[in-house]
């Protein structure tokens, strides 16, 4: 194998900050994610208007699909690239590209240009989300990570809520739909300036040319081909082509071949693999990645199909169907903050994950009983249960993976986690759509079988016609929820694989000979601000501190003993 010692090939970027400066960094990350989520959730509101303006009624879904595919592709790459080129430089660069892409969306005069710009938005936006978690990993001790990362959650939810409202307001103005992108572009630019000023930075020790030589180019190429082929095949199933079409089979074949090549390259040739295969040799991490995939499946399937259930089967208004998602979103924030606080105080992450998965399983099983006559209160309660499950398990799974890996691998394991989450979301929506359509094709009366081609084709039907097709839709939606329940069962099985060792016992640290290795994070039982109180003024700067000095500043008990 061509692998080198990762810890020696990469420069140290961990830089714990004093509490006031740490809070400023976390708030900056939250502000950036607020802007990103306005864009992500505002687009769907504008799709009908954009389709009419650009004459793209048949292909407008690619505005979202191109972004999702690019996000998934680049979510794999950013972790290792940030190890090589530095977190801050890559983060600010991604924000700059995001701003340019948003501007391009606003000036798009054809569907192809719009889709290309949305892909660029996804490539940069996915990296921003990834790097936000990785930067938080660098500046917050492992034990307190959940607590501070939960501070970011309200910003993301606020962006989710404001996105559709801002989009609707701008669309009615003289700026039309283009105004949303013209608004977000300067906000992204300002966010880049803010991040460049506030975020800590540890400059790479090697030259740019030397860093370029470290990049796993073959691994990046083969992973991109594998992911794009798979995502295009899955995203288009039932919409642009049937799952058994020659196009789908060809895409999946190319994707499979590229995936095998990627595994071989990462195993035999890559000096700094973008995904070290060694992380999959850790059963705990593999199980957590599987749980992340299934969690993404269940969550995204609900976000996509609950409105379809509400509008097509229950004949509720679009406003009501949108409000139904609020319990899932709102409770996730509250529970995520509670879970983060609990992990910091208890020193354990397993309890919150187990409770979250249990709630997810119970909620998903109860959801299979949704039908035409289900009481609205039952629907809301079940969605609250699912939201509690997602909120309690989502972020703690990140902390759990980081606790089971070396420090040098935490950036790539974070990227891998986000990749599996995006992949699970995409597969959840695509497979659920295929289940919905296949069930409708099999059960709809002959005169209405064409309705299986589009979940939004019911708008022009009379109440009498809706009553005729309602049993078929009820059966199809139930099958979708049964598939989500199956994913939840699979997620629960992962609980029997990994164990909670806390934050203090990690024998696989990069430097086993370092006397302070085990002390650095066990001493975090004191608040992080206490760790900083003993630092000299120069030690709290954003610059690099010598390794020996840094160890001293992170071990206050040793300082008290006169180290």
From Swiss-Prot:
PROSITE patterns: MFS. One of its GO terms (molecular function) is transmembrane transporter activity. Induction: Expression is induced on squalestatin S1-producing YMG medium. One of its GO terms (cellular component) is plasma membrane. The keyword Zinc does not apply. It is a multi-pass membrane protein. It comes from the Eukaryota. Keywords: Glycoprotein, Membrane, Transmembrane, Transmembrane helix, Transport. It is found in: Membrane. Residues 504-563 are annotated as: Disordered. Belongs to the major facilitator superfamily. TCR/Tet family. This is MFS-type transporter M2. It comes from Phoma sp. (strain ATCC 20986 / MF5453).
């Amino acid at each position: 194998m061509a692998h080198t010692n990762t810890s020696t090939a990469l420069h140290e970027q961990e830089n714990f900050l004093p509490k006031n400066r740490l809070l400023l960094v976390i708030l900056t990350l939250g502000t950036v994610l607020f802007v990103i989520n306005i864009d992500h959730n505002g687009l769907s509101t504008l799709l009908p208007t954009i389709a009419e303006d650009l004459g793209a009624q048949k292909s407008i879904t690619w505005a979202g699909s191109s972004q999702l595919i690019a996000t998934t592709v680049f979510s794999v790459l950013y972790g290792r690239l940030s190890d090589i080129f530095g977190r801050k430089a890559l983060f600010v660069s991604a924000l700059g590209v995001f701003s340019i892409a948003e501007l391009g969306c606003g000036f798009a005069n054809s569907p192809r240009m719009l889709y290309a710009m949305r892909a660029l938005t996804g490539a940069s936006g996915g990296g921003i989300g990834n790097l936000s978690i990785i930067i938080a990993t660098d500046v917050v001790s492992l034990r307190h990570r959940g607590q501070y990362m939960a501070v970011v959650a309200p910003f993301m939810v606020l962006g989710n809520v404001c996105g559709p409202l801002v989009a609707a307001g701008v669309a009615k103005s003289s700026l039309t739909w283009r105004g949303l992108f013209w608004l977000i572009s300067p906000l992204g630019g300002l966010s880049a300036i803010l991040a460049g000023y506030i975020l800590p930075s540890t400059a790479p020790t090697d030259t740019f040319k030397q860093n370029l030589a470290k990049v796993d180019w073959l691994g990046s190429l083969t992973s991109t081909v594998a992911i794009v082929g798979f995502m295009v095949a899955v995203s288009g199933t039932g919409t642009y082509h049937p799952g058994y079409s020659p196009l789908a089979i060809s895409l999946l074949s190319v994707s499979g071949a590229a995936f095998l090549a990627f595994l071989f390259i990462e195993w035999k040739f890559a000096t700094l693999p973008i995904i070290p295969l060694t992380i999959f040799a850790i059963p705990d991490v593999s199980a957590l990645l599987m749980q992340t995939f299934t969690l993404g499946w269940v969550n995204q399937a609900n976000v996509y199909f609950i409105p379809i259930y509400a509008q097509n089967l229950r004949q509720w208004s679009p406003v009501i169907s949108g409000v139904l998602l609020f319990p899932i979103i709102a409770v996730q924030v509250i529970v995520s903050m509670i879970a983060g606080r609990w992990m910091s105080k208890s020193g354990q992450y397993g309890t919150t994950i187990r409770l979250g998965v249990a709630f997810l399983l119970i909620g998903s099983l109860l959801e299979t009983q949704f039908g035409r006559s289900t009481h609205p209160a039952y629907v809301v309660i079940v969605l609250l249960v699912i939201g509690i499950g997602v909120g309690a398990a989502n972020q703690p799974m990140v902390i759990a993976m980081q606790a089971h890996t070396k420090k040098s691998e935490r950036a790539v394991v974070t990227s891998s986690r986000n990749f599996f989450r995006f992949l699970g979301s995409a597969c959840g929506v695509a497979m659920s759509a295929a289940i919905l359509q296949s069930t409708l094709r099999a059960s709809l009366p002959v005169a209405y079988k064409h309705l299986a081609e589009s979940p939004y084709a019911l708008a022009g039907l009379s109440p009498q016609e809706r009553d005729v097709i309602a049993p078929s839709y009820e059966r199809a939606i139930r099958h979708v929820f049964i598939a989500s329940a199956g994913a939840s069962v699979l997620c629960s099985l992962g609980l029997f694989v990994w164990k909670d060792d806390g934050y203090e016992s990690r024998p696989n640290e990069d430097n086993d000979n370092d006397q302070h290795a085990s002390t650095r994070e066990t001493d975090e039982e004191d608040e992080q601000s206490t760790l900083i109180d003993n630092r000299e003024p120069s030690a709290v700067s954003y610059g690099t501190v010598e390794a020996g000095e840094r160890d001293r500043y992170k071990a206050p008990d040793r300082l008290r003993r006169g180290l």
